[in-house]
Amino acid sequence: MHLVGNLEQWWEHGERVALRLGDTDNIVFTRAEGAGQSMTLLHGFPSSSHDWAKLAPRLSAGHSLLMPDFLGFGASEKPTEHRYSLLEQADLVEAVWARAGVGSTRIVAHDYAVSVAQELLARQAEGALSVAIEGIHFMNGGIYPELHRPQPLQLALLDPQQGPQISAVINGELFTAGLGPTFAPGFDARSDSAEIWRATSRDGGEGISHLLIRYISDREENGDRWIAAIEQTDVPLAFIWGMLDPVSGAHMAERIRERLPDAPFLALEDVAHWPALEAPERVAHALLSDSA
């Protein structure tokens, strides 16, 4: 059985590299491991690539894994005067691919990252992507933005007046309390929540929470484009879904199954928002078994 390293060990075995995003150079953390078919794993909000720590040992035997931290998250740079956007995060993924020499890859996208993957899919459809996406696995995210149900803390952060004030005073206790309802009842989330907080608060990252939360507005602005990207693509898609998720759970699953009835869909009935943390064995099995 592979041992799962803690956050410091995770960072120690990755690297922080300078990538050009727009007109500026930004430091981005990436972790690569394994050998074989390329698989790019993209994390959610408000966490980091460490979300994949329980899966990586199971996947790396037959896959070359690439796991970046998005700008503003984890061990990546966290500029305080910045307009964060999902489009820029898609640029970041492209830059990570270019640096690693990736020509084709499968994508695994959770939460926040489902929109990044949808944008990359749209770019591929337009002939504007240099990397071939061979398949995408989506996990618990706002694929259909109008069905996304933000948690109270997220809504408060999105408010122009409250958001900066909350970012200025948020602490580990408030943060982990906000995460609590997103885990399944009975799941002991203490360790995972603590690690997510440590990744978030690195370099004072909690202070930009109100800037990162703008992804919700990005989804509203780009929703038509991103929905078309998944509903019109020939790229194999599959879904691994925690049905107890209060944010994007059973209600989102219903729409996905209605609009994409032929896509493989694994419903995890006892899992909430964090399939990779709550049910890593089942998620790994699905990723290794499905065609996407």
What role is predicted for each listed range?
Residues 268-284:
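Catalytic histidine-centered segment of alpha/beta-hydrolase-like enzymes
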Residues 1-39, 60-63, 98, 102-103, ...:
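Alpha/beta-hydrolase fold catalytic core
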Residues 205-258, 267:
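Conserved serine/cysteine hydrolase catalytic core
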Residues 122, 126-166:
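Flexible "cap/lid" loop of the alpha/beta hydrolase fold
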Residues 173-188, 195-201, 212-218:
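Helix-loop "lid/cap" segments that line or gate small-molecule binding pockets
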Residues 15, 21-23, 31-33, 66-110, ...:
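Active-site loop/oxyanion-hole signature of alpha/beta-hydrolase fold enzymes
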Residues 31-75:
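Conserved HGGG/HGGXW glycine-rich cap/lid loop of the alpha/beta-hydrolase fold
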Residues 116-120:
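Hydrolases whose catalytic domains are alpha/beta-hydrolase-1, hotdog thioesterase
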